[in-house]
Amino acid sequence: MESSQGRRRRPGTVVPGEAAETDSELSASSSEEELYLGPSGPTRGRPTGLRVAGEAAETDSEPEPEPTVVPVDLPPLVVQRDPAETWGTEETPAMAPARSLLQLRLAESQTRLDHDVAAAVSGVYRRAGRDVAALAGRLAAAQATGLAAAHSVRLARGDLCALAERLDIVAGCRLLPDIRGVPGMEPEQDPGPRA
């Protein structure tokens, strides 16, 4: 619409002439096949003319109407739009002024359901938290018991190694009397083979 305001205004007259048969055919005469309608007086900055693009339907059997002048007393066509109608705004349904009993009951039921679901979820999380804490305590106790058992095994191994070394020292010592036999009893000698 802004580009049409920059064009030169034409008076509201009908120019006689023949319409072009095709869009590619250019008019060589000075007359144009456009019809501009509008008041003859000064305008208020709005374009009042109408240009219809396209090919005119014309046959030889149709009589050519006499060109007539448009009456100047016709006011221009003005389209007024509602200022509330703007593009890009989302239409939302209007809220009902009074809610019915069914809607109130549904809202109460929905509130109770939301509360029950929230309570159930929080209860599940609380129980799961307690179970995890109990399992963590049991795991810590099992780790402490395992560490204590491993320490006891290390101590017992060290004691057994020390005892084995002492037994080796005692068994390897030649200074001590032979404690295997009873004193005074000589072991019997096996007589040799008889002939």
Swiss-Prot record:
Major subcellular site: cytoplasm
Tissue spec. comment: Ubiquitously expressed.
Low complexity bias spans: 25-51
Any one of the GO CC terms: axon cytoplasm
Modified residues (Phosphoserine): S61
Modified residue annotations for Phosphothreonine: T59
Regions of compositional bias (Basic residues) in chain numbering: 1-11
Keyword Cell cycle applies: no
Subcellular location: Cytoplasm
Post-translational modification: Phosphorylated.
Pfam families xref list: BLOC1S3
A Gene Ontology biological process term: positive regulation of natural killer cell activation
GO MF terms held by the record: protein transmembrane transporter activity
Top-level division of the source organism's lineage: Eukaryota
Keyword terms, alphabetized: Albinism, Cytoplasm, Hermansky-Pudlak syndrome, Phosphoprotein
InterPro entries per record: BLOC-1_complex_su-3
Stretches for region Disordered: 1-72
Assigned protein family: Belongs to the BLOC1S3 family.
Function text: Component of the BLOC-1 complex, a complex that is required for normal biogenesis of lysosome-related organelles (LRO), such as platelet dense granules and melanosomes. In concert with the AP-3 complex, the BLOC-1 complex is required to target membrane protein cargos into vesicles assembled at cell bodies for delivery into neurites and nerve terminals. The BLOC-1 complex, in association with SNARE proteins, is also proposed to be involved in neurite extension. Plays a role in intracellular vesicle trafficking.
Disease with which this protein is associated in UniProt: Defects in Bloc1s3 are the cause of the reduced pigmentation (rp) mutation phenotype, a mouse model for human Hermansky-Pudlak syndrome (HPS). Rp mice are characterized by abnormal melanosomes and display altered expression levels of the proteins of the BLOC-1 complex.
Binding partners and assembly: Octamer composed of one copy each BLOC1S1, BLOC1S2, BLOC1S3, BLOC1S4, BLOC1S5, BLOC1S6, DTNBP1/BLOC1S7 and SNAPIN/BLOC1S8. Interacts directly with BLOC1S2. Component of the biogenesis of lysosome-related organelles complex 1 (BLOC-1) composed of BLOC1S1, BLOC1S2, BLOC1S3, BLOC1S4, BLOC1S5, BLOC1S6, DTNBP1/BLOC1S7 and SNAPIN/BLOC1S8. The BLOC-1 complex associates with the AP-3 protein complex and membrane protein cargos. Interacts with BLOC1S4, BLOC1S5 and BLOC1S6.
Protein name (Swiss-Prot/TrEMBL): Biogenesis of lysosome-related organelles complex 1 subunit 3
Originating species: Mus musculus (Mouse)
Record gene name: Bloc1s3
